[in-house]
Amino acid sequence: MNFNEILYGVAYYDEYMPYDRIETDFKMIRDAGMNVIRIAESTWSTWEPEEGVFDFTHLHRMLDCAAKYELKVIVGTPTYAIPSWLAKKYPDILAVTHNGKELYGHRQNMDITNPDYLHHAQIIIEKLMEQVKDYDCVIGFQLDNETKPYDTCSKYAQAKFVEYLKNEFPDIDEFNREFGLDYWSNRVNDWDDFPDVRGTINQSLAAEFCKFQRSLVTKFLSWQADIVCEYKRDDQFITQNFDFDWTTHSIGYQSQ
């Protein structure tokens, strides 16, 4: 892949905007000297309004208009904000964290280790890729959005954590010794008795769980990349916009 210009652009969401704005907006984007837009990552419920029913009208409007105004496009996989029907049918998809069970309504409230979530995420990614793969204006793909482990502490995540520890410490006595778990009777004598890690007072074990949670993000994004790679062209890239503490760097928040 070769770019002979700096990519400079903006995120655009036709599904949020007054529908008659798209021609005006894309002309303004081009005339402002921008050359790329990012689309699609925030509206799973628009692309799949009910289970198994897909509507990519807004997607094709944006891609066709981008081609008309010679704008490049980065397409995001729409997996960081789940539709309401998914949360209702599979309530276990809503993450369990140190603060308890998530409620539906905000983004990034799902458990990225949940099998039902992963099953439906794969379906929407594949459907999206089928829609965009033949557009020349699509130059790359963003996996998910601002991905983090979201403090996932579900039964699925904790079971994976126990397997991770068993691989790291085949001898359970060594595990207890390394983490100092004899203190306050925290010793684990059988892996099947491993307690809910959210209750631990052992900061070494808590830190190990945080480390493990971050590894879940790597696996999640690698899993998405494998799906996207089945569809993308050789001249298209894959990227991700990792989140960071951006609020303190936003206008109006900087220290004077």
Over which residues does each language-model region extend?
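Short, well-ordered coil/turn segments that N-cap beta-strands
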Residues: 3-8, 33-35, 67-73, 134-139, ...
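Short, solvent-exposed turn/loop segments enriched in Gly/Ser/Thr/Pro and often Arg
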Residues: 13-15, 40-43, 76-85, 139-148, ...
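Polysaccharide-binding and catalytic clefts of secreted carbohydrate-active enzymes
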Residues: 103-255
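Aromatic-lined substrate-binding rim segments of carbohydrate-active enzymes
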Residues: 23-32, 36-102, 129, 224-232
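Boundary/entry segment of secreted carbohydrate-active catalytic domains
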Residues: 1-21
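Glycine-rich anion/phosphate-binding loops
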Residues: 17-22, 52-58, 115-123
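Conserved strand-to-helix beginnings and helix N-cap segments that scaffold or border functional pockets
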Residues: 19-23, 56, 154-155, 251-253
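A generic structural signal for short coil/turn motifs at secondary-structure boundaries
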Residues: 17, 46-50, 113, 150-152
